């Protein structure tokens, strides 16, 4: 299924409905940034919102840690994550490993580790 953002591009005519990148859209880089940001946001709020942000970040990290997104050691150009995207509208860096995806993935994992050890995440 396509994301809400890609649906907007379809309606605006920027992509055809048969564009393979839209039909099979995945972006580990956006997911890793989001997971890290949600963990940071969880440190600023309480109770229900904290729980929602933390649980959502953990769902994302679990998905990114699966064989679908995490590369085998020594493969994928030695990047950690597969299936990142730089710029769909420009057809640039689509479904490739990106260093900033790995960076934010590791940042999110470190933040989560600090959180479960009752240390400040920042």
PLM regions with names:
Residues 1-5, 9:
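Single conserved hydrophobic/aromatic residue that forms the stacking wall/gate
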Residues 13-18:
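Interfacial loop at the N-terminal end of multi-pass membrane proteins
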Residues 20-36, 42, 47-122:
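CBM-like carbohydrate-recognition segments
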């Amino acid at each position: 299924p396509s994301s809400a953002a890609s649906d907007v591009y379809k309606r605006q005519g920027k992509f055809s409905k048969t564009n393979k990148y839209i039909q099979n859209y995945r972006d580990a880089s956006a997911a890793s940034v989001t997971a890290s940001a949600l963990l940071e946001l969880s440190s600023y709020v309480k109770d229900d919102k904290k729980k929602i942000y933390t649980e959502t970040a953990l769902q994302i990290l679990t998905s990114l840690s699966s064989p679908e997104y995490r590369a085998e050691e020594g493969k994928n150009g030695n990047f950690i994550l597969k299936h990142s995207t730089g710029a769909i509208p420009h057809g640039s860096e689509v479904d490739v490993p990106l260093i900033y995806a790995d960076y934010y993935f590791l940042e999110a994992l470190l933040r989560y580790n600090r959180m479960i050890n009752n240390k400040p995440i920042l």
